[in-house]
Amino acid sequence: MLKSSPLHSASVASGLLKCFLGAHPLLPATYEKCGLTTSCRRSTTIHSPAKIWQPPSCRYFSKSRPILSPLPETSEQSSPSYLSTANKPPGTDEQGLKSDRGDINSDSKSTSKTSRSKKSNVPRSSKSTTQKREKPEKPRELEPWQIQKQALKKKFPEGWNPRKRLHPDTLDTIRHLHQQDPNIYSTPALAQEFKVSPEAIRRILKSKWQPTPEVAAERRERWEKRRKRIWNQLSEIGVRPHRPSFADVSDTKVLEKKRRTVGSK
């Protein structure tokens, strides 16, 4: 066999490579990029003018869509209360915080008051009540005026009427008539005649007080002046004053009546 020379083998290898590359041109990426870029640069430099780089305008950013998509709104942010608070100015937030603090303070005060009222309304322990009930109540001693009041209630069940003020002469007449004949001029008869309670007649008869002659004379003058004044007033009007039944009673007339009754018998 013939030995192939190195030149012949090199030419064969190069021919095979050319054939293979001509049918399927396999060029490296770098070579292809460089070739394309060079051709593009040449074509651009020749056919189209050079473009200078300029910064993008603000309109581009305003018209362009945001790169980051907006976050989804939560339920709290979508609520009307959140929107109203977001639209409020900053001063209103401070006022709202103050009002919230005031509401909290008022709520705490009201709760404290209610707790105090509940404590005050809580009934006391039954021990104190049982101790008070167990102690026997001693009979309270009555004072003298209370004893007298009870006695007067028994004596006057209908109530106490004020004493009728009588003329001093009538008082003397009552005493004198009772001394003359106690059976006829008894206490009920004198009370009915002078329109006074029986107790008042009893006290008049029991009393032994008598005025001095000077006091009696002054009293008579005063009562005489009073009688004349009343009579003059009534006479001016044209009315005759009414005289009670005991006005005609006097010691002499009483004695005369007694004598007549005795003589007739």
UniProtKB/Swiss-Prot annotation:
Residues 1-68 form a transit peptide. Residues 72-87 have a biased composition (Polar residues). Residues 69-167 are annotated as: Disordered. Pfam families: Neugrin (PF06413). GO terms for cellular component: mitochondrion; nucleus. Keywords: Mitochondrion, Transit peptide. Its main location: mitochondrion. The keyword Mitochondrion applies. It comes from the Eukaryota. It is found in: Mitochondrion. Belongs to the RRG9 family. Required for respiratory activity and maintenance and expression of the mitochondrial genome. This is Required for respiratory growth protein 9, mitochondrial. It comes from Blastomyces gilchristii (strain SLH14081) (Blastomyces dermatitidis).
